[in-house]
């Protein structure tokens, strides 16, 4: 009864008001399920290709009618009659039909939407929660949230070079209580910013984008907010950074806070930050093509903090494998739309796990009401999730889904808190 009888694509809007792709899978049993794909603002050079129309008369060239048409014709023709529960085959058929390294023929947005819709339909067909269908009986770890509360870089119109300043609540013994600590700190941060005369408008991911000039200012604001909210920095709540440094890397130099820095200079900067603030995680600390610098960064800080590859790895198992071989980074950011199928995403997570790298399930800056990544985080026992701040429904939807999952799991639910980072210096 899990035979696919129809696949439908449509153009919908993401949280930035840009078109994106939704796919619906219809099974013989009558089950109907849909999935919406996200879209990123700062993208890695090796990401799978998001197919856009380029017609300036529609949505300023950002329409996705070609991708939708590919779903309604080529992909539908390919998958109708297939068994939805054979996810590996479903994804392989689409990859082979596309025939390109970066899914530029059918579009990664078309392929991924169908991949996720089929998985969701199969879970409903089997009368299982999505996390249970994807992860089996052992899916029970709720993730520590990395909450992006101050925005800079490509996500904001201020002078901060680093893209994200995150709070990482690890206290409370449960996801719900840790989330509460993060939310309370977010609200206190708002009042701290207001008191100091800064704007409290929120950016794409629900964080604030105040007109701060220096990294130190942003970190000091976080420390103050954590403390004023009644929590202990470095005990209850840690700090995480996404430098997104490929965005300010040019001609072999990093243009950071109006200075030209080398890779070694950046490493010294991070050592100073880690020595001064309770920073537990640094994402894309160096540029995606600066592999020599990454080796040195990993050597310098790899046993102290989580060094996350996002643009560096683009959720691509081949690139992750190469990075592991070269002792680069110690953590992988997982974004479904960077690679473009559920199967390849699960492969990337597994590759991280068997090589003792942590995996962080992540949203994109252009999101939707779709909560697939919340279930994926629990399904894979990843232990960490990045899905924005404590405002904007497109971000909060994921947190609410995780609250539901934790409640459903009851006493079987595990929240690791600080132990999610046990391989680093904050081991209990």
From Swiss-Prot:
Name of a matching Pfam family: Enolase_N
Keywords per UniProt: Cytoplasm, Glycolysis, Lyase, Magnesium, Metal-binding, Secreted
Subcellular location: Cytoplasm; Secreted; Cell surface
Protein known as: Enolase
CC cofactor: Mg(2+)
MF term (GO), any: phosphopyruvate hydratase activity
Predominant place of localization: cytoplasm
Binding site for Mg(2+): 242, 283, 310
Active-site residues from the entry: 205, 335
Cofactor comment: Binds a second Mg(2+) ion via substrate during catalysis.
Chain's role: Catalyzes the reversible conversion of 2-phosphoglycerate (2-PG) into phosphoenolpyruvate (PEP). It is essential for the degradation of carbohydrates via glycolysis.
Family: Belongs to the enolase family.
GO biological process: glycolytic process
Binding site for (2R)-2-phosphoglycerate: 163, 335, 364-365, 386
Reactions catalysed: (2R)-2-phosphoglycerate = phosphoenolpyruvate + H2O
């Amino acid at each position: 009864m899990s035979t696919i009888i129809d696949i439908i694509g449509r153009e919908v809007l993401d949280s930035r008001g840009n078109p994106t792709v939704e796919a619906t899978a219809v099974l013989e049993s009558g089950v109907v399920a849909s999935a919406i794909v996200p879209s990123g603002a700062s993208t890695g050079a090796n990401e799978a290709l998001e197919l856009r129309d380029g017609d300036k008369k529609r949505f300023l060239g950002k329409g996705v009618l070609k991708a939708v048409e590919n779903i309604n014709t080529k992909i539908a023709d390919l998958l109708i009659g297939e068994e939805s529960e054979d996810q590996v085959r479903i994804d392989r058929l689409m990859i082979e039909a596309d025939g390109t390294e970066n899914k530029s023929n059918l579009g990664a947005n078309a392929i991924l939407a169908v991949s996720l819709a089929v998985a969701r339909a199969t879970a409903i067909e089997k009368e299982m929660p999505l996390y249970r269908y994807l992860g089996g009986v052992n899916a029970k770890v709720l993730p520590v949230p990395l909450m992006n509360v101050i925005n800079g870089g490509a996500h904001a119109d201020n002078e901060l070079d680093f893209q994200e300043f995150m709070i990482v609540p690890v206290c409370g013994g449960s996801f719900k209580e840790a989330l509460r600590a993060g939310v309370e700190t977010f609200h206190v941060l708002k009042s701290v910013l207001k008191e100091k005369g800064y704007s409290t408008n929120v950016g794409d991911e629900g964080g604030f984008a105040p007109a701060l000039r220096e990294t130190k200012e942003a970190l000091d604001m976080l420390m103050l907010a954590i403390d004023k909210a009644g929590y202990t920095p470095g005990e209850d709540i840690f700090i995480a950074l996404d430098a997104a440094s490929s965005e300010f890397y040019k001609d072999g130099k990093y243009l950071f806070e109006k200075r030209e820095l080398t890779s070694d200079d950046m490493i010294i900067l991070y050592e100073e930050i880690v020595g001064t603030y309770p920073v537990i995680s640094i994402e894309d600390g160096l540029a995606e093509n600066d592999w020599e610098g990454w080796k040195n960064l990993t050597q310098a800080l790899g046993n102290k903090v989580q060094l996350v590859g996002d643009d560096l790895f683009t959720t691509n198992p081949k690139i992750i494998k190469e990075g592991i071989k070269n002792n680069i980074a110690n953590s992988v950011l997982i974004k479904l739309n960077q690679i473009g199928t559920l199967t390849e995403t699960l492969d990337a997570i597994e590759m991280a796990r068997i090589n003792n790298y942590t995996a962080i399930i992540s949203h994109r800056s252009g999101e939707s009401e779709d909560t697939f990544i919340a279930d994926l985080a629990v399904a894979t026992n990843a232990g960490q999730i990045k899905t924005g701040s404590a405002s904007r429904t497109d971000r909060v939807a994921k947190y609410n889904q995780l609250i539901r999952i934790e409640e459903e799991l009851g006493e079987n639910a595990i929240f690791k808190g600080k132990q999610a980072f046990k391989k680093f210096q904050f081991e209990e």
